[in-house]
Amino acid sequence: MDTSSINAQSIFDDNAAMLKLSWLTGHEGWERGFSSESVANATSSADLVGHLNLIHPNRIQVLGDAEIDYYKRQTDEDRSRHMAELIALEPPFLVVAGGVAAPPELVLRCTRSSTPLFTTPMSAAAVIDSLRLYMSRILAPRATLHGVFLDILGMGVLLTGDSGLGKSELGLELISRGHGLVADDAVDFVRLGPDFVEGRCPPLLQNLLEVRGLGLLDIKTIFGETAVRRKMKLKLIVQLVRRPDGEFQRLPLESQTVDVLGLPISKVTIQVAAGRNLAVLVEAAVRNTILQLRGIDTLRDFMDRQRLAMQDPDSQFPGKLI
């Protein structure tokens, strides 16, 4: 990921109000940020933000009551050495939390080295938790996929397929049936956790749906506030295809998945043909996926039933054919 836009200034601007940050000194170092190597080597945002640690240093160092008390108990020589080591790490910025006064030597060294120094009355633990969550969001893997992203029965569903298959028309019909639009045409996905991918609409396309022959439709204005969603977790991908029956698998024996940002997402394929009610089929696919997430697999149950019937046919068909 490009980390050039992530620097002390941008992090301060995004978090100053929530964390009650004040920029004490080191304004000249506003461009300080994270190297691509440090971000690539980080296993989580916890590797980028943490309490003062000179042995295994974090990129953003937070000094709270305990760290300042420890600093005050040191000799002048040890204080100077620790401050020199801290500044030598070249962190994007330092935070003195808990409402304690920043040590004068730290302020002086930050001023001389143009190291941004922030202060806040909030506790160090609260600052670290908030910054870790913030870093995990802005550094999370991202991708933009083509399709219509909808909230169907509380599940995030992405309609995909070749151009001209009627994805937007299908999305419009599903919206008219009470479901919600997240994004049309381009959907921004981000992996915010180990087990889920979240999808949002780009600001430029917010609430808009493009339908051939009708142009752009403002779904929020036409159908109301409840017809749009800000974000949804991606749980199902519905691929629309147009192909002969001979190439279409009616009963797939194995569940289909698509890799999205390293996470397997369930996928169903629906054939587009004249006279088919695609909206009903999509709703049925979503309901079936919900059952599968609850451990109910209709195909597996049928195969088990069939196997039992083959082993003991008389139990299934006690009567005799005449």
Curated annotation (Swiss-Prot):
Residues 209-218 are annotated as: Important for the catalytic mechanism of both phosphorylation and dephosphorylation. It is an enzyme of class 2 (transferase). Mg(2+) binds at residues 168, 210. Keywords: ATP-binding, Kinase, Magnesium, Metal-binding, Multifunctional enzyme, Nucleotide-binding, Serine/threonine-protein kinase, Transferase. Its EC number is 2.7.11.-, 2.7.4.-. ATP binds at residues 161-168. Its cofactor is Mg(2+). CDD domains: HprK_C. Residues 271-276 are annotated as: Important for the catalytic mechanism of dephosphorylation. The keyword Magnesium applies. It catalyses: [HPr protein]-L-serine + ATP = [HPr protein]-O-phospho-L-serine + ADP + H(+); [HPr protein]-O-phospho-L-serine + phosphate + H(+) = [HPr protein]-L-serine + diphosphate. GO terms for molecular function: ATP binding; magnesium ion binding; phosphorelay sensor kinase activity; protein serine/threonine kinase activity; protein serine/threonine/tyrosine kinase activity. Pfam families: Hpr_kinase_C, Hpr_kinase_N. GO terms for biological process: regulation of carbohydrate metabolic process. The active site is at 146, 167, 185 (proton acceptor), 250. Catalyzes the ATP- as well as the pyrophosphate-dependent phosphorylation of a specific serine residue in HPr, a phosphocarrier protein of the phosphoenolpyruvate-dependent sugar phosphotransferase system (PTS). HprK/P also catalyzes the pyrophosphate-producing, inorganic phosphate-dependent dephosphorylation (phosphorolysis) of seryl-phosphorylated HPr (P-Ser-HPr). Homohexamer. The Walker A ATP-binding motif also binds Pi and PPi. Both phosphorylation and phosphorolysis are carried out by the same active site and suggest a common mechanism for both reactions. Belongs to the HPrK/P family. This is HPr kinase/phosphorylase. The lineage of its organism: Bacteria, Pseudomonadati, Pseudomonadota, Betaproteobacteria, Burkholderiales.
